[in-house]
């Protein structure tokens, strides 16, 4: 993940981003918390699905932790209004 992606991830807590893992898996997620500290920098997130009307709904009731090293990139989702602090 680039420094710009990491910066966006940190600013997007409580917002939904597109996430791509180094394995190639892609999904939408609500970013809960980013912990960019040793020994295991990671992000806590909740996977979400986009409904036909554009709304997002949780795809699970439990969140998950993903190591920052396992994230290839993050991006804002087209058509979603982000507040200024969460924009790239």
Q: What spans do the regions from the language model cover?
A:
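Conserved RNA-binding domains used in RNP assembly and mRNA/RNA metabolism
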Residues: 1-88
């Amino acid at each position: 993940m680039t420094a710009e992606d990491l910066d966006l991830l940190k600013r997007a807590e409580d917002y939904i981003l597109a996430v791509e893992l180094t394995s190639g898996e892609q999904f939408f997620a609500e970013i809960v918390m980013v912990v960019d500290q040793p020994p295991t920098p990671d992000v806590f997130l909740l996977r979400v699905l986009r409904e036909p009307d554009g709304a997002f709904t949780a795809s699970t009731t439990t969140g998950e932790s993903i190591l920052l090293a396992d994230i290839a990139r993050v991006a804002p989702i087209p058509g979603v209004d982000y507040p200024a602090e969460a924009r790239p």
